[in-house]
């Protein structure tokens, strides 16, 4: 079967919206900081709960926090300390796209993740 690729934005959005869960996981990759990139010799890695990230785009640029949760359905991450204020004054977490953050510290509790990273010893 031949795969037809389109450059139309509506078809790109539809493809992301209709993507199966194993593909959505790939959309949750975030770039590593310069020091981590040097250490692990990788540019991007999947964000997991517990990683420390720094926001690089948007209204919350420069803010740093720990990932509190991951929404695979909407392909967004929830960062501790990044929130919006509702009209009634309550704070609600602000979901952020994984490509708009930079991983500054990795959570290395998972042995499989450490093996996959490899890197310099």
From Swiss-Prot:
Matches recorded under SUPFAM superfamilies: Translation proteins SH3-like domain
Annotated Pfam families: KOW, Ribosomal_L26
Entry keyword set: Ribonucleoprotein, Ribosomal protein, RNA-binding, rRNA-binding
One Gene Ontology MF term: rRNA binding
GO cellular component, one term: large ribosomal subunit
Keyword Ribonucleoprotein: yes
Any one GO biological process: translation
Region (Disordered): 1-23
Family of the protein in this entry: Belongs to the universal ribosomal protein uL24 family.
Summary of subunit composition and partner proteins: Part of the 50S ribosomal subunit.
PANTHER family the UniProt entry points to: 60S RIBOSOMAL PROTEIN L26 FAMILY MEMBER
HAMAP family referenced in this protein's UniProt entry, alphabetically: Ribosomal_uL24_A
Function (record text): One of two assembly initiator proteins, it binds directly to the 5'-end of the 23S rRNA, where it nucleates assembly of the 50S subunit. Located at the polypeptide exit tunnel on the outside of the subunit.
Entry protein name: Large ribosomal subunit protein uL24
Originating species: Methanoregula boonei (strain DSM 21154 / JCM 14090 / 6A8)
Gene: rpl24
